[in-house]
Structure formats: C-alpha cells, structure tokens
C-alpha cells in the first residue's frame, strides 16, 4: 500500500536539486498518518492479513497500526537510529497489553471501527 511518498529537496545555495534523480522516497515518521489510514481502509475492505509499516518508531506507533487493522507490523527506518527498535516495540506492546489487561493481541486488531 505504501512504501514511501515521493519527495523533492532543493539546494537553495547551488540552486539545483539536492537529490541526483530530482526526487526520492520519503519514509519514516512523516508517512505514518498516511500509512495508518491506508491500513484502516484496507482492513475495512478485505479479510486478509495486513502488515502495517511506515513510521513505526515505538510501541504506540505499532499499536495505532494494530488498532487500525494490521495483523503484523514492521519496523524500518527506526532501525537506522536504534538497532534495538523492533525489540523495544515488541516489549512496549507487551507492556500495553499487561497494563490494559489484554490477553490476546487479536483482541486489538482492528478494534477501532
């Protein structure tokens, strides 16, 4: 559904494109609201597993995707800054489930209607 949004960067001092191909893929936290919406819309339209990705940097981000309908999530860009990001996301989800007494993560999938 979404990998990146096409973006452009201009070097104002050289008055030229800062990216060799003029445009490039913008990913990470900037695309998360779009990605969450797309997961939600897909989950409403089909009954197949959906992997939520795009801007997940912590457990709260991952939980947004799960509540929107993702059956799994993927951590991408955050791994560049923190090689433990995926582990921390998983631990954060476990903490959330304990805090809110959720026994089965499937109870969270698509819980936002």
Regions found by a protein language model. Give the residues of each.
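Glycine-rich phosphate-binding active-site loops on the catalytic face of alpha/beta enzymes
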Residues: 1-8, 55-56, 60-88
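Glycine-rich beta-to-alpha transition loops that act as phosphate-gripper elements at the mouths
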Residues: 32, 48-60
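Glycine/Thr-rich beta-alpha phosphate-binding loop at enzyme active sites
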Residues: 1-44, 48
